[in-house]
From Swiss-Prot:
Residues 71-79, 140-161, 232-254, 317-537 are cytoplasmic. Residues 401-505 are annotated as: Disordered. Glycans are attached at residues 26, 29. This is P2Y purinoceptor 4. SUPFAM superfamilies: Family A G protein-coupled receptor-like (SSF81321). Residues 448-465 have a biased composition (Polar residues). Residues 409-423, 431-447 have a biased composition (Basic and acidic residues). Disulfide bonds join 116-193. Receptor for extracellular ATP, UTP, CTP, GTP and ITP. The activity of this receptor is mediated by G proteins which activate a phosphatidylinositol-calcium second messenger system. May play a key role in the early development of neural tissue. It comes from Xenopus laevis. GO terms for molecular function: G protein-coupled purinergic nucleotide receptor activity; G protein-coupled UTP receptor activity.
């Protein structure tokens, strides 16, 4: 950090932003043992950049974690890695307000030494855990593309949980010395929270920082580059179709994702580590003051890029994870459809829906709440001792053939379109706003289609009625079946108890006294149930 007193071979001093740069350079030329920095730019750059990362990164990462938890269960290995990556980004973003205050107040830290150590720890913990989780994702995707059979057999979510625990443990152990090095230094007018350490310990800190950089950045960087290079080579292999060689769209999309990840990795992490290493060793070697100033400015500019990784990771989730992309799009569409429906009702309060061709879907018996009998007596009170007879076989058959009707109308549901005002067109409902020529023509087409559909339904209904009249299927109660057979009564009766279950009897298979009612598939799923005897109303 530039707020640290530099541990070079000559004495160095930090300036305030109030001294002009020309005077500082003249002072540097006159005294060879003094190198003066002008760091006024960072008091504007860092607060603004950290504030932007906080305002953008916090909602994005919280939304990502919510989608992972609420919309994407159960998790696969990639989802496990991405959730831990989002958790790491969220913890770091939550620490940024303290740094915004620190740099806006010109290197004044009023929060104490413990919080200073914690904030610096979170920065490097997020930095290196992000790199390691991206490495895990890269290795997992490489195995899935280049070795799909072995990856399915050997890699699952449990293994991913273990790997993530090892990543957190490794990063924490590697950064424990950083908690010891980082400290605060009280000055006359302010208190400095060192990003590195005190000047007398700076040489040892550089050695430690170099080892951590090679272990947690250098090696993962090589692994990521190797995995994505091999994946690109595998995906670039075309598929031979006849005499032509084509590259499928999913392979092109995967290659674009790889390019995006590599560019994001290069922008966020590479410049920061290169300029930081140059800055540390330039201070140790005691190079010329002008060159040291240039390296210092470059290092400060690249620090916001490392923090911006917390905002780029959610974009990576959207591009690299198909499940995340589908869940996010579905959630956004559901949220946006609610105000559209409200606007539709408020903008057209007097319009009445008109039914188009085809019957409406019938609610299944399980969806009807039941508190006893659906039949009411003369006093209007519900009773379990009453029964209603249904003599209209068409209503019964409509219930029995509900699934076939819905399936027949499924093709109409797929033809959903947008009306003139951009609102969703609802199936079987048409809102007439204007009686113009085009509307009348569409109504004529709708009438023709409805007549055809009604004709088909009538033909199907006739066939079912003929079956009922022949006695192939019969609806009746248990004890009343014998009486109905003697009288030749074929009128089906409806059971109004409970969930209004429809019961189907096959009299040829059972005796007159021991008849069982077989539930319709929608309600009973093939289970048999005895009908209870209720007196006819």
């Amino acid at each position: 950090m530039t707020e640290d007193i530099m541990a070079t071979s000559y004495p160095t001093f930090l300036t305030t932003p109030y001294l002009p740069m020309k005077l500082l350079m003249n002072l540097t030329n006159d005294t060879e043992d003094i190198c003066v920095f002008d760091e006024g730019f960072k008091f504007l750059l860092l607060p603004v950049s950290y504030s932007a990362v906080f305002m953008v990164g916090l909602p994005l990462n919280i939304a990502a974690m919510w989608i992972f938890i609420a919309k994407m269960r159960p998790w696969n290995p990639t989802t496990v890695y991405m959730f831990n990556l989002a958790l790491s980004d969220t913890l770091y973003v939550l620490s940024l307000p303290t740094l915004v205050y620190y740099y806006a107040d010109k290197n004044n830290w009023p929060f104490g030494e413990v919080l200073c150590k914690l904030v610096r720890f979170l920065f490097y913990a997020n930095l290196y855990s992000s790199i390691l989780f991206l490495t895990c994702i890269s290795v997992h995707r490489y195995r899935g593309v280049c070795h799909p059979i072995t990856s399915l057999r050997r890699m699952n979510a449990k293994h991913a949980y273990v790997i993530c625990a090892l990543v957190w443990l490794s990063v924490t152990l590697c950064l424990v010395p950083n908690l010891i090095f980082v400290t605060v230094s009280p000055k006359v007018k302010n208190t400095i929270c060192h990003d590195t350490t005190r000047p007398e310990d700076f040489a040892r800190y550089v050695e430690y920082s170099t080892a951590i950089m090679c272990l947690l950045f250098g090696i993962p960087c090589l692994i990521i580059a190797g995995c994505y290079g091999l994946m690109t080579r595998e995906l670039m292999k075309p598929i031979v179709s006849g005499n032509q060689q084509t590259l499928p769209s999913y392979k092109k999309r995967s290659i674009k994702t790889i390019i995006f990840v590599m560019i994001a990795f290069a922008i966020c992490f590479m410049p920061f580590h290169i300029t930081r290493t140059l800055y540390y060793y330039a201070r140790l070697l005691g190079i010329k003051c002008y060159a040291l100033n240039v390296i210092n400015v470059t290092y400060k500019v690249t620090r916001p890029l490392a923090s911006a990784n917390s905002c780029i990771d959610p974009i990576l989730y959207f591009l690299a994870n198909d499940r995340y992309r589908r869940r996010l799009i579905r959630t956004v569409r559901r949220r946006s459809s609610v105000p559209n429906r409200r606007c539709m009702h408020t903008n057209h309060p007097q319009t009445e829906p008109h039914m188009t061709a085809g019957p409406l879907p019938v609610i299944s018996a399980e969806e009807i709440p039941s508190n006893g009998s659906m039949v009411r007596d003369e006093n209007g009170e519900g009773s379990r001792e009453h029964r209603v007879e249904w003599t209209d076989t068409k209503e019964i058959n409509q219930m029995m053939n509900r699934r076939s009707t819905i399936k027949r109308n499924s093709t109409d549901k797929n033809d959903m379109k947008e009306n003139r005002h951009g609102e969703n067109y609802l199936p079987y409902v048409e809102v007439v706003e204007k009686e113009d020529y085009e509307t009348k023509r569409e109504n004529r087409k709708t009438t023709e289609q409805s007549s055809k559909t009604n004709a088909e339904q009538d033909e199907l209904q006739t066939q079912i009625d003929s079956r009922l009249k022949r006695g192939k299927w019969q609806l009746s109660s248990k004890k009343g079946a014998a009486q109905e057979n003697e009288k030749g009564h074929m009128e089906p009766s409806f059971e109004g108890e409970g969930t209004s279950t429809w019961n189907l009897l096959t009299p040829k298979m059972y005796g007159k006294k021991d008849r069982l009612a077989k539930n319709v598939e929608e309600v009973g799923y093939g289970k048999e149930k005895e009908l209870q005897n209720f007196p006819k109303a």
